[in-house]
């Protein structure tokens, strides 16, 4: 039996981050967490590109373009969608989730899902660096692990 696990060493990785400007109070904290996680595990600042998009709905489009135009090892997708009183929340959450999922099934690099979908702003704040940790940081670790898993599979 062979067990393959990814490591959290990120020397010489090139990482793209696409982040939503909508709910920037929270997405900026997710971004800080992601960058912190990447730097702490060996990614250099010059190997991190950050692209801001207007809202969460635009994340899959830009993530696809980033994968097409640059030689990234992974792309981290960060955003926040907070439930309101209309169905708009459901539509945005569904389409962003499907879009990033589609990229993962069609692309040769991992696209990490870091879009918070919460019932209220308090839940979003909790997941952006307070009670529930920082999901941006968690996404950075997921990106590193997935890139390393991919390398190990290719080497077999």
From Swiss-Prot:
Which pathway does UniProt place it in?
Answer: Cofactor biosynthesis; riboflavin biosynthesis; riboflavin from 2-hydroxy-3-oxobutyl phosphate and 5-amino-6-(D-ribitylamino)uracil: step 1/2
Q: Name one GO cellular component term.
A: cytosol
- Give the top-level enzyme category: transferase
CDD domains given for it? Answer: Lumazine_synthase-I
Keywords of the record:
Riboflavin biosynthesis, Transferase
Task: Tell me a Gene Ontology molecular-function term this record carries.
Answer: 6,7-dimethyl-8-ribityllumazine synthase activity
PANTHER family documented for this protein: 6,7-DIMETHYL-8-RIBITYLLUMAZINE SYNTHASE, 6,7-DIMETHYL-8-RIBITYLLUMAZINE SYNTHASE DMRL SYNTHASE LUMAZINE SYNTHASE
Instruction: State what protein this is by name.
Output: 6,7-dimethyl-8-ribityllumazine synthase
Q: Please name the source species.
A: Streptococcus agalactiae serotype V (strain ATCC BAA-611 / 2603 V/R)
